[in-house]
Amino acid sequence: MKLDFAGERVLAVVAHPDDVELLCAGTLARGREDGATVGMCTMCRGNRGMAAGESANERSFGVSEVRQGEFTAAAKLLGAEVFFGGIGDGELEDIPKQRRELISIFRRYRPTLVLAHAPNDYHADHRAAFELAEAASWFACSAGHVTGEEPLERPPALWLMDTVEMHDFSPGFYVDVSEHVPLKRDMLGCHKSQLERAGDSDFAPLEQLMLRQAQVRGEQAGTEAAEAFRIHTVWKRVRAW
């Protein structure tokens, strides 16, 4: 299929503040290039993203604010609107209160296309973020779910993003992001608090992970760099391109 994002309102719904750069920043940049409006929503605050050896007491105060600032700075480079779910790391789940928050975000932003985590990604917050995005994409159109904003006229299309490290994900299609790798790197560079964790034994160096994934998906697609997706084929969340 030939993608043209002109006129679209694309919203990436991710679990953590640095997930966009790893999985879909190049596609959002492609959208902006085509004339789309793009947005980024992180459901979790990133409050537990601290270096090994540091106690919660040492860094818990202010971590959320730091990561919110990093997320906002990265979005500014892209020209994206930002939204925050405000949930603590590890506490994300598909429950009514969290659904209502994302439904409200959908109704304020009014996306035509949502990029969401794959339902089998490695992190529990990623899987919960998918469940919330999938549910909100439907209930945001229902007048029975009252949030104070007007319901959407129709559900947005829903694309599933690649999994981190490409585990157990069969791409349905690829987006060529070769020209946007420098922007992905610049955006990732905004997340200084996480880049400082590169030496942690339990934390993958983010830039290496991001570049390796873009390169491998690019090789599969016959281009320098790519991001992989799959269309979520459920009723009214599918449309022709």
Regions picked out by a protein language model, each given a short descriptive name:
Residues 1-109, 230:
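Active-site rim/loop-helix segments in enzyme catalytic domains that contact anionic ligands
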